[in-house]
């Protein structure tokens, strides 16, 4: 009878789940206090007026209003603010 030796086992076959990072509310959108605006690793975006920063660097609205993205400062940092309507 024909025989075939067993193949070796592989050490691949793992992958981490996607973390669903990114901008959740874009410029000009209305948000309520507590709404998540951006989920990020590190501070790609910085918190501006009426925006809080969670311990995982998630930016969230502290007040109701419209989202405003702006670039300012000598290092051209990106700030996100909430402008009251």
Swiss-Prot record:
A GO molecular-function annotation: structural constituent of ribosome
InterPro entries: Ribosomal_bL27 (IPR001684), Ribosomal_bL27_CS (IPR018261)
GO BP annotations listed: translation
Cellular component terms (Gene Ontology): cytosolic large ribosomal subunit
UniProt keyword terms in alphabetical order: Ribonucleoprotein, Ribosomal protein
Region (Disordered): 1-20
Oxidoreductase in keyword set: no
Magnesium recorded as keyword: no
Similarity comment: family membership: Belongs to the bacterial ribosomal protein bL27 family.
HAMAP family documented for this protein: Ribosomal_bL27
Alphabetized PANTHER family for the sequence: LARGE RIBOSOMAL SUBUNIT PROTEIN BL27M (PTHR15893:SF0), RIBOSOMAL PROTEIN L27 (PTHR15893)
Protein name: Large ribosomal subunit protein bL27
Origin species: Cronobacter sakazakii (strain ATCC BAA-894) (Enterobacter sakazakii)
């Amino acid at each position: 009878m024909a025989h075939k030796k067993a193949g070796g086992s592989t050490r691949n076959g793992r992958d981490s789940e996607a973390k669903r990072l990114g901008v959740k509310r874009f410029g000009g959108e209305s948000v309520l206090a507590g709404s998540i605006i951006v989920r990020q690793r590190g501070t790609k975006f910085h918190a501006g007026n009426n925006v809080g920063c969670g311990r995982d660097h998630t930016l969230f609205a502290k007040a109701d209003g419209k989202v405003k993205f702006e670039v300012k400062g000598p290092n051209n940092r990106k700030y996100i603010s909430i402008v009251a309507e």
